[in-house]
């Protein structure tokens, strides 16, 4: 099977997918290591036995409804490549608005806290609550380093909080991958410093969090319970706990159906853990 034949086969198999062309292209890139341009230029190139087997398996899994991101283990968010598994929600483009809002607010924070010599009076403390893959907090740190030129020693102290131990492991892996790459960080000491700015806490909301923060960033579960169950029928395999906004303090169904039960618990706790003048971005 060559690449052109694989494309035709994949599109036919995934004809009921919302985006068969894109799905097939991403899966072929995943199994071959080629980019989109190379796939076009090398369309007559034969897949190896291993590549063909992996491609057919990926198509089979996609047909069950499993998202492409879970098959490849990767999802781009805010221009960065995040590792994902079914232990965490796949980062959504809409959430990038939260990053923009946080960066705009942090720019004002740094401006207000800058001394005449350029040093910073106060380093912001940030909590990424219900962190999942860590995409929100990590994207903020990465953007501050790369785009805003914030020195490593002036980076915010970032606390990632999630009820799921498995999700926190994904956050840790993404932090190591994305903050340990060395882009704009010129020596190993800086890499250590960047990662040392981060802490991870497994907690049901703020139950195990003893700290106060200048910023709390959160994209909590907000989908009504019945809708969450319906969404998962398509085989997407996303974690129910990360979707369902109608869970109680024990992670069980609360009996409500507006998706706001968890948020109504979360917001008062946020204000208890914000410093005077602190900011909640949800």
Residue ranges of model-derived segments:
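Short conserved AdoMet
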Residues: 15, 210, 274-275
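Conserved SAM/SAH cofactor-binding pocket of Class I
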Residues: 97-228
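Mobile active-site "lid"/loop adjacent to the S-adenosyl-L-methionine
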Residues: 149, 220-262
């Amino acid at each position: 099977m060559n690449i052109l034949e694989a494309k035709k086969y994949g599109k036919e198999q995934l004809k009921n997918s919302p985006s068969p062309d894109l799905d097939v292209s991403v899966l072929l890139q995943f199994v071959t290591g080629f980019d989109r341009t190379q796939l076009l230029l090398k369309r007559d190139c034969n897949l190896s036995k291993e590549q063909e087997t992996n491609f057919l398996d990926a198509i089979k899994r996609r047909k069950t409804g499993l998202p492409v991101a879970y098959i490849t283990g990767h999802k781009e968010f805010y221009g960065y490549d995040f590792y994902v598994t079914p232990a965490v929600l796949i980062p959504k483009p809409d959430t990038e608005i939260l990053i923009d809002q946080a960066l705009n607010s942090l720019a004002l924070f740094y401006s207000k806290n800058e001394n005449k010599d350029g040093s910073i009076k106060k380093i912001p403390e940030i909590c990424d609550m219900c962190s999942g893959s860590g995409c929100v907090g990590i994207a903020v740190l990465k953007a501050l380093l790369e785009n805003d030129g914030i020195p490593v020693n002036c980076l915010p102290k970032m606390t990632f909080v999630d009820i799921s131990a498995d999700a926190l492991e994904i956050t840790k892996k993404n932090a190591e991958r994305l903050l340990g790459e060395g882009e704009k960080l010129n020596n190993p000491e800086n890499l250590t410093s960047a990662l040392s700015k981060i802490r991870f806490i497994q907690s049901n909301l703020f139950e195990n969090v003893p700290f106060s923060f200048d910023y709390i960033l959160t994209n909590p579960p907000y989908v009504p319970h019945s809708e969450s169950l319906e969404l998962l029928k398509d085989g997407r395999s996303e974690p129910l706990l990360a979707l369902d906004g109608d869970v109680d303090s024990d992670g069980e169904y609360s009996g409500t159906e507006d998706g706001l039960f968890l948020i109504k618990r979360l917001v008062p706790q946020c204000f208890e853990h914000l410093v005077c003048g602190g900011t909640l971005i949800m």
